[in-house]
Amino acid sequence: MNKSELKPALVFEQFAKINEIPRPSKHEENMIEFLKSFGEAHQLETLVDETGNVLIRKAATPGYEHAETIILQSHMDMVCDKLVDVDFDFHKDAIQTYVDGEWLKAKGTTLGADDGIGCAIELAILASNDIEHGPIECVFTRDEETGLTGAHGMKAGFMTGKMLINLDSEDEGEIFVSCAGGQTTHATFHFSREEAPAGYFFMEASLKGLNGGHSGDDINKKRANAIKILARFLFLENEKLDGSLRLVSFNSGKMHNAIPRDGKIVFAVKNADKEQVRADWNIFASEVEDEFHVTEQTMQFNMSSSDAAPVIKKAVADKFVMALQAVDNGPLTTCQDEAIAWMVETSSNVASVMTDESSINIVASQRSNVMSNLANMTNTVKAAFLLAGAEVTVGDKYPAWKMRANSELTDLAVKAYEKLFGKEPLVKGIHAGLECGLFSERYPELDMVSFGPTLRNVHTPDEALLIPTVEMVWDHLLEILRSVAK
């Protein structure tokens, strides 16, 4: 299979166009202009709100003008991540894709199918002339990945439909009817630097090759967190060296909503201890590799000498390492309802640590399907960093989307799936934030579902789209549109 044979052709044509457009989160200007031009070229009513969300309306197929208006929604931004050795500028370069068996992938970067494929499906609906449907509103929100900015900023009345299909889910055959709420915690350790004592040797330790992944949807997959592993080594080694280890820098993770998959620490130890530290690192690496021998088979531990540099004041560095060792990470509780007892209810992810000349900045993200538990988890993380002397702020929260009893749209979506594929879809919730949570606050009467084609390893350069599932989602969506229209 080559790219010219991908089906539905109209969807993949639109996806190819989208991947020519740089669209990092918070930098969606080119995508907004593309969508405006698309709407105008097809003579469709096109609106852009103050936040930058785009809405394109398409009139009903003749004879279905009085049908219920249905909203199709996706987000226009993408997570930008690449392999370390890949030369790529997400603000200028087009995503380069290739077919690998039944999967569509990108060359060394994120693919942008989250949620570019949702946008492509919407554009294909708008461009098509042979689909039966009632009135449609196609909505493209901005900056979903780094703050749900578009959904936060959307005012009541921008959308007018009473049913909404969100096209930002990642497992074909699953229909999502609820999602977790979330919040981020930001901790900063301020410090001054000093010269290391005489007789110290500088070392660099790095970890790479972890799977990473989405900090909501993948949090229960027993994947390693690079930050927690490196912090664990520093804590253990400093204890073993009677507190003589001196920290220069700690850098790991890039995005608040991804599990960090690589990282690097620079530190100094007494000359007399350097060989012991190397031996300890190798033992530590073997232990961690054994702990994750199923889920992390490509992790790589490296250690080398490093140039001398001013070290962080010891009192601050030690408290920083202790805080990272102590702070909760991973899935913490599962849902109490028996029907979904398998699903993560509350989690936390230490997402990024960045060191500059005078501060260490940490971002951790908390999620829960129960808003009171979200507040408690956020306070738990906050308290750990406050106890260590950090300056802590908490970001805006987004609400959970609660399952709607007697949802007409869920019923339509399930029946359409059964008609097409002869089996029941899985109706479930997701431990990740969807814009549906914010829409449910602004539009409390909105009946919503979320589904999409199968994606793997989102938010990483290994992101992949399962090609056959795109046609399945397309057919499913068209059947729902026909059902609503009739």
Located regions from the model:
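Midchain, well-structured core segments that form catalytic/ion-binding scaffolds
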Residues: E102-K105, E145-T146, A156-R367
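His/Asp/Glu-rich mid-to-C-terminal helical/loop segments that flank catalytic regions of hydrolases
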Residues: K36, G157, K222-K240, A272-K274, ...
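Substrate-recognition/cap regions that form aromatic- and gly/pro-loop-enriched pockets
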Residues: M343-A432
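Acidic/His- and Gly-rich active-site-bordering loop/insert found
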Residues: N2-E102
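Zn-dependent metallopeptidase/amidohydrolase metal-coordination segment
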Residues: K7-V11, E345-N361, F421-E479
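Active-site-adjacent substrate-binding region
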Residues: N225-I227, R232-F250, M403-L446
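Active-site metal-coordination/substrate-binding segment of hydrolases
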Residues: Y64-T146, A151-K162, F202, A317, ...
